[in-house]
Amino acid sequence: YITNLNGTMNVINKIKTKNFIFASTGTAQDCTSAYGISKRAAEDVVREYCTKHKQQDYTIFRFYNVIGSDGFAPTNPDGLMYNLIKAKTTKEFTIFGDDYNTSDGTCVRDYVHVNEICDALKQSIEKPSNSIECLGHGVGKTVIDIVNMFKEVNNIDFEVNVGPRRKGDIESSVLANVSPYMRNLYTMDQ
């Protein structure tokens, strides 16, 4: 909490720019975790500071479930894509919870490609919104949807195990209002 809040305050006080772009998270919307609460507080700092210093525009981006590849192995060992890539060699994958109130019992997420995030950031440099912009598609996919898609695209098969729910996982995280900065450059099939 302190890192996000104090770090944001230090950066915004030191950097003198006409357009401040802040990277937040979709979890700031519902504040269901300490991380989400800390990012929401940091968003408030950005908005208050930039509003009081009227010469400074801002855009706050709430990133939803960012996916995509840069040619290197993903670095989040808890992330879905990291574990799917790992399953190519281990030949097994674990889904955490299959008893959610969703179409197949697994969590639903709104995935957005990292290149779409970059595109939105570039647009905001040219035209800041002075508001919070949520980056997602407004369309959810279940974990099983993603696992099956991954298997099909990579023409592989592996065992899928079901483990207990992870602490803090929410049933569904799908964006309701899609930002105008989202150009829908990719679909999940891509």
Positions of the model-derived regions?
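Short-chain dehydrogenase/reductase
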Residues: 1, 5, 32-40, 74-82, ...
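Conserved Rossmann-fold NAD(P)-dependent oxidoreductase catalytic core, especially the SDR/UDP-sugar
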Residues: 2, 6-36, 52-59
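Hydrophobic positions on the long internal alpha-helix
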Residues: 7, 11-15, 46, 120, ...
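Conserved cofactor-binding/catalytic machinery of classical short-chain dehydrogenase/reductase
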Residues: 7-10, 19, 41-42, 113-116
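Structural signature of the Rossmann-like NAD(P)-dependent dehydrogenase/reductase core
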Residues: 20-24, 59-65, 110, 134-136
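Flexible, glycine-rich beta-alpha linker
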Residues: 28-34, 61-79, 102-103
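Active-site Tyr-X1-5-Lys
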Residues: 32-64, 83-89
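C-terminal substrate-binding subdomain of Rossmann-fold SDR/epimerase-dehydratase oxidoreductases
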Residues: 86-190
